[in-house]
Amino acid sequence: MMMNKSKTDWAKDTPCKNITIYGYCKYENDGCIFNHGKPLSTSSNTGGAAAGSAEDSAASGGVTVGNTGKSTFNAKTATSFTPSVAIPDFNNIPSFTPERIVSSPAGDGATAFTPSFNPYGSDSFNPSANVSGPGSAVFAAASGNAGASATAAPRSQSVHVGTGGYLPLAGTAFPTVYPPSHSILQYHLYAPDPPPHLQVPLKANERTPETLFIPNNLREHLLKRNLSALQVFPSDGNLPDIVGDYFGLVPLEFHNRQTGKGRYLGHQNSLYKVFSNFDGKVYIIRRIHDVKTTDVGQISLPFRKWQKVSCPNVVKVKDAFTTLAFGDSSLCVVHDYYPQSNSLYETHVANYTVVPVTQKYLWSYLVQLSNALNEVHRHGLSMNNISLDKVIVTGDPGRIKVGDSAVHDILAFDEGRDIAKEQQADYSAVGALLMDLAQRMLGTRDQPLDSMDIDPLFKRVLAYLLSDEKKTIAEFTALFSHKMLDIISSSQTYSEYIEQHLSRELENGRLFRLMCKLNFIFGRMESSMDIHWSEAGDKFPIILFYDYVFHQVDENGKSVMDLTHVLRCLNKLDTGVSEKIILVTPDEMNCIIISYKELKDSIDSTFRSMTQ
């Protein structure tokens, strides 16, 4: 079959991609219409020049010459890639210069490679950017310098409880889980919904782009949570790189408010966000400074009890251990991490935008704290020192959790404890917390309960909690049992709202899989020589449909990027509707009338033939 020469003249100056990819073209003498000219050789035929280039390469530490005359590349000793052609001068191009660059000692005869930007060496990105601290040994080990890693300070051994028998690998200096990306999520670039007074009324069968995805406020809230979970801050050099099975410590307390002396039995404390080297998840570590432990059961026994507590209003305990990584014997208790969560103190008192306390919030907090009390007391434990700092708000509508679980039980392990008395104190602590919030709602401090202008039933509940009589969870919840129905209704409504939007996103990867299938079969090199992909072939409508969906242009020749058009076409193609469309060639000389069902069958058969 002879091709029209006028139709192949356009390819005579186009280099054949087979030459570029494979170095040869098996169709060169069998009808390939592309240019098969050999690229100019940059190597010299003189032995002196070859020897000189080999010596220069060997001096750079990347290439060695053997007895056979063949040069070999050694990646371990190579410092940088040096191409054999002329390199443009980039010295005049402005580039980012970090404030501090972490450099690793290079091997003998090698020049250290210093990148123009190192995110893990810059104070703006890396939370452990100190060069002289323990992190220097980590970078030395990662660079392959055995001498530096041999002189690194050994890691302190930690006594772990909640790792399920997992122990870190001996000699492992760098975490096996890579730190998260530092790129900022551009959620603010999404087009927001128009204000209510500008929204156009829609018919029952009409949709807007906003209705095709999750609501903007919910998406923005979830993206902010992800950003908060991955966010890190520059280290001041006083924090270790790795603590037990966790790395990437980020301080979380910034308001500098002193904790009550009785909360941690007089010990100082710190709170950090960490990344687990065991499962890659994000947790928080409550560090109690300078804790002396003499009995192994002091940590293991309380931890095992608290691990059995499973309540939506109590923060789950994940791990507990002691470590010397901070320079003292510190107790570290690991809990689940809830991004964008604040304590009740930060939510209603300390933040710049304080959330006003309402009677609805008070009833919601009361019901949830009652649920936490019931679950903790049922396991023979007590919460101890419930306060505005210990209860965190994890989301709307007013969802709270009691944190710092198991810390007090470990610190007071050796002391003679009366659990029944501590459980009665929990009721009084809940009453004092709600009393404080009620006074803040009214704007008065130290106001007697009898003179407070609040719901009489709520006032009766507070009087019961603050009284000296013995309390039980049954008597306590019986006072406001009908109020629980409102909280249950609100919680179920919110769950159905989230489930509704989740069901809409259930198959959101369906169109992505379809686009992947189209790109797998479209534009392949071997297709240019296949008669089935020519204008008279049965696969040519796939090419025209691809251009119809993604390569639209207006009357001025400007590219049109219409998301609605793409979604409409791909949805019809995925379902295989019988609707027919007209596909026109770029030169507008030919057109094809074909249905989406026929297109789908053609794409599926082509994809199956590639996978067989």
Curated annotation (Swiss-Prot):
Biological role: Regulatory subunit of the poly(A)-nuclease (PAN) deadenylation complex, one of two cytoplasmic mRNA deadenylases involved in mRNA turnover. PAN specifically shortens poly(A) tails of RNA and the activity is stimulated by poly(A)-binding protein PAB1. PAN deadenylation is followed by rapid degradation of the shortened mRNA tails by the CCR4-NOT complex. Deadenylated mRNAs are then degraded by two alternative mechanisms, namely exosome-mediated 3'-5' exonucleolytic degradation, or deadenylation-dependent mRNA decaping and subsequent 5'-3' exonucleolytic degradation by XRN1.
Family: Belongs to the protein kinase superfamily. PAN3 family.
Segments for region (Pseudokinase domain): 231-481
Keywords: ATP-binding, Coiled coil, Cytoplasm, Metal-binding, mRNA processing, Nucleotide-binding, Zinc, Zinc-finger
Gene Ontology cellular-component terms listed: P-body; PAN complex
Residue span of region Disordered: 44-64
Stretches with biased composition (Low complexity): 44-62
One example GO MF annotation: zinc ion binding
Chain positions recorded as ATP binding sites: 286, 336-343, 389-390
Chain intervals annotated as zinc finger (C3H1-type): 10-39
Residue segments, region Knob domain: 521-612
Matching InterPro entries: Kinase-like_dom_sf, PAN3, Pan3_PK, Znf_CCCH
Coiled coil: 482-520
Subunit (UniProt): Homodimer. Forms a heterotrimer with a catalytic subunit PAN2 to form the poly(A)-nuclease (PAN) deadenylation complex. Interacts (via PAM-2 motif) with poly(A)-binding protein PAB1 (via PABC domain), conferring substrate specificity of the enzyme complex.
Motif PABPC-interacting motif-2 (PAM-2): positions: 84-104, 111-131
Domain notes per entry: The N-terminal zinc finger binds to poly(A) RNA. Contains a pseudokinase domain. The protein kinase domain is predicted to be catalytically inactive because some of the residues important for catalytic activity are substituted and it lacks the equivalent of the binding site for a peptide substrate. However, it has retained an ATP-binding site and ATP-binding is required for mRNA degradation, stimulating the activity of the PAN2 nuclease in vitro.
The UniProt record lists the keyword Zinc-finger: yes
Name of the protein this chain belongs to: PAN2-PAN3 deadenylation complex subunit PAN3
Subcellular location: Cytoplasm
GO annotation, biological process: mRNA processing; nuclear-transcribed mRNA poly(A) tail shortening; postreplication repair
Pfam families tied to this protein: Pan3_PK
